[in-house]
Amino acid sequence: MKASELTAKSVEELNAELLGLLREQFNLRMQHATGQLTQTHQLKIVRRNIARVKTIITSKAGA
């Protein structure tokens, strides 16, 4: 997910994207805790995508 793709979206779309990412992060954390997650780098990727979305939401709210 690129920041340029996110800036084109509205705040409502970004909030929906954020909700989906948070759910994905929760599922990955549960899989990691139970030992089912083999691709642990996905946790890092999702965490950074959440940060990207939150940053864009904050910048749009300030504008």
From Swiss-Prot:
GO terms for cellular component: cytosolic large ribosomal subunit. Pfam families: Ribosomal_L29 (PF00831). Gene3D superfamilies: 6.10.140.1970. InterPro entries: Ribosomal_protein_uL29 (IPR050063), Ribosomal_uL29 (IPR001854), Ribosomal_uL29_CS (IPR018254), Ribosomal_uL29_sf (IPR036049). GO terms for molecular function: structural constituent of ribosome. The keyword Ribosomal protein applies. The keyword Ribosomal protein applies. One of its GO terms (biological process) is translation. Keywords: Ribonucleoprotein, Ribosomal protein. Belongs to the universal ribosomal protein uL29 family. This is Large ribosomal subunit protein uL29. It comes from Shewanella pealeana (strain ATCC 700345 / ANG-SQ1).
